[in-house]
Amino acid sequence: TYYNAGLTKAKNRDLSGAADTLRRSVKLNKRNIDARNLLGLVYFEMGETVQAFSEWVMSTNIQPDNNPAEKYLVAIQQDKGKVSELNHTIKQFNIALDYAKRGTDDMAIIQLKKVLNQNPNFIKAYQLLALLYLKGGQYERAKKSIKKSMKIDKCNPLSIRYLREINEYMDEEKKTDPDKRMERRRNLRGVMVDREYLSGNDV
């Protein structure tokens, strides 16, 4: 079943694969509480707190009694500081996203570091940070950021793609002299400006 496949992927830290499989499961059967609750846990582990809460709330609406989702919600809501921190993190990520879209990369990077300090599992923040470092020619930092994200979700397609691109740029840099290296980085910045950034609502 989709649920069992999703559970296996989650245990193997293929979180994006698990989320995709579990979404199919709840699409086929909206009342599949086990799949919906697990999907919420997967989202939460990826730093996607809004999506996690959404799944758990829907789950408790479908089955109010004897539902583990109620415990998840209560545990988080009882910690007022945690709720406030999570809400603040979302706002900070959206600010960082706006800075990135406007080309204010330094400010975006500062915001993303704050986001990851508060929510160290936020995959999208690592990905955007890596993209900005890549844009600035800071390949080692970009690679470090992506590798951190892949410790959380090792099969994330976007992370795999970014890591491949980073490695390609690093390999190319080794073949060029310092002057050409700087010119290449300037050209890279122009290419990255046109790249579509992640949306805070994408999963």
Segment roles from a protein language model:
Residues 11, 45, 79-82, 101, ...:
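Register position in tetratricopeptide repeats
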Residues 23-27, 58-61, 116-117, 150-151:
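Conserved structural position within tetratricopeptide repeats
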Residues 33-34, 67-68, 89, 123-124, ...:
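Helix-start (N-cap) detector for alpha-helical repeat units in TPR-like alpha-solenoids
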Residues 1, 77-91:
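TPR-adjacent "capping" and linker segments in tetratricopeptide-repeat scaffold/adaptor proteins
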